């Protein structure tokens, strides 16, 4: 579990149920894509990344993925397919490191 405190609000999230975080166009807004639900947080990816462990990887400026929920990586098209069939983009400079991390897991 991870706890986020934003002003008066506390949000508890089960890290294992999170597939990825996605930055929205609005400043300091992030969608948490979960196995069961999606919620919007008033935070930055950097704020979230600092609270998470090694099971999450920032694969693109707009995405922070849960490595345990990755089903497949299409290296040619730089697409991550998650266990729930959602997809994320992998930044070109992040692809090789992500593949190394997955091979070690």
Predicted regions: what they are:
Residues 1-83:
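Conserved binding/recognition cores within well-folded domains
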Residues 46-49, 95, 99:
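Generic solvent-exposed, charged/amphipathic alpha-helical segments
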Residues 77-98:
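C-terminal structural segments of small proteins and small subunits
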């Amino acid at each position: 579990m991870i706890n986020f405190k934003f002003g008066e609000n506390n949000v508890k999230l089960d890290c294992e149920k999170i597939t990825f975080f996605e930055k929205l166009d609005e400043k300091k807004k992030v969608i948490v894509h979960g196995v069961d639900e999606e919620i919007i947080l008033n935070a930055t990816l950097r704020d979230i990344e600092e609270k998470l462990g090694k099971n999450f990887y920032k694969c693109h400026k707009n995405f922070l993925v849960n490595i345990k929920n990755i089903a497949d990586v299409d290296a040619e098209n730089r697409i991550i397919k998650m266990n729930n069939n959602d997809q994320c983009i992998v930044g070109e400079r992040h692809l090789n490191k992500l593949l190394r991390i997955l091979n070690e897991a």
